[in-house]
Amino acid sequence: MQESGYVPLKIADPALLFAELGRQPLPGMSLEEMADLMADLGEPRFRAKQLFQWVYQKGVKDFDAMTNLPARLRQHLAGTTMLRLLEKETEQHDRRTGTTKYLFRLADGSQVESVLMRQSWGNSVCVTTQVGCRMGCTFCASTVGGLVRNLTAGEIVDQIVMMQRELPQGERISTVVLMGSGEPLENYDHVLKAVRLVHDPEGLNIGYRHITISTSGIVPGMRRLAEEGLPITLALSLHAPTDELRRQLMPVARIWPLAEVLAAAREYGEKTGRRVTYEYILIEGVNDGPEEARQLARLLKGALAHVNLIPMNPVAERPQYRRPGPERVNRFKEILESNGIATTVRREMGGEIDAACGQLRNRAQRKHMGR
């Protein structure tokens, strides 16, 4: 059912891009699809599992590395398929936090950002689901320039595979968050296929409970995801405790009021048994005061909830918004916790990289345009 005022995203399927290139992308194919490919080539079914592992688990960049495949098959695949869908353009390191941000180029020349965070408990990655974004959140760099296109499931998964390759031998990615540029629930089919591929034991083998999907509050998508029966963590970008303020910050709030968004979030928690994470960006003088904290506490009272506070990262394209000082951040957190709301403050990426999502891509585009 179409919600009043909401026009579902209607753009060409990104998979058509590869049809135009005349090569079939291997990233994005399920084990069953690879089995069909092998059958079409007259190969035994077990070759599909071998190929699947080379593409996802081992992440090789050259068909010659697939040593357990016959030379004739490797040669055929090299001429008719694409093994990797991304090319690393640049990277930024923050030595203090062990965070690396990557800028990848896609087959059509588009660029996307991904982040690898190395931590004591494991390695996590933040990946992008769209080139650009049409949500129009006023504090976000990703929306500058609007939406270009959806990513395919293969392009989403390949970000993870490429970052897995960057880790020392013996280390692996343990947590995936789909919280980069774009609205994942507007690219639902490709995102869900990517999640299933990431989970596959023959591939990256990352448990559903270690995968998070973020949304700005696309209510039909939230309800649909709840019906999937997957124990994925849902992260809802809330960012304001009232409809009036949320509409100012997030155009999507003009379609679904807070009551409807929160009802969908509670439904998700009830159906999956997973605690919903509420993302809340703190903007100095806009939504970071004690009254906003008390309003947020009342809003989430009794819900299976965890609030993740995100002090505003500087965004060149959004100079009107500033980051609050530590005292205001801590005061906001204390008010929530005193009301029984589990709350954390997001770990800093650090000042050595463009921390805000979308910054690296925007800078590269400005450089390309000579600005």
Curated annotation (Swiss-Prot):
GO biological process, alphabetically ordered: rRNA base methylation; tRNA methylation
Annotated active site: 113 (proton acceptor), 357 (s-methylcysteine intermediate)
UniProt keyword annotation of S-adenosyl-L-methionine present: yes
Major localization class: cytoplasm
Pfam families per record: Radical_SAM, RlmN_N
Co-factor binding comment: Binds 1 [4Fe-4S] cluster. The cluster is coordinated with 3 cysteines and an exchangeable S-adenosyl-L-methionine.
Intrachain disulfide bonds: 126-357
Catalytic activity: adenosine(2503) in 23S rRNA + 2 reduced [2Fe-2S]-[ferredoxin] + 2 S-adenosyl-L-methionine = 2-methyladenosine(2503) in 23S rRNA + 5'-deoxyadenosine + L-methionine + 2 oxidized [2Fe-2S]-[ferredoxin] + S-adenosyl-L-homocysteine; adenosine(37) in tRNA + 2 reduced [2Fe-2S]-[ferredoxin] + 2 S-adenosyl-L-methionine = 2-methyladenosine(37) in tRNA + 5'-deoxyadenosine + L-methionine + 2 oxidized [2Fe-2S]-[ferredoxin] + S-adenosyl-L-homocysteine
Chain residues that bind [4Fe-4S] cluster: 133, 137, 140
Family: Belongs to the radical SAM superfamily. RlmN family.
Name of the protein: Probable dual-specificity RNA methyltransferase RlmN
Organism encoding this protein: Symbiobacterium thermophilum (strain DSM 24528 / JCM 14929 / IAM 14863 / T)
Organism lineage: Bacteria, Bacillati, Bacillota, Clostridia, Eubacteriales
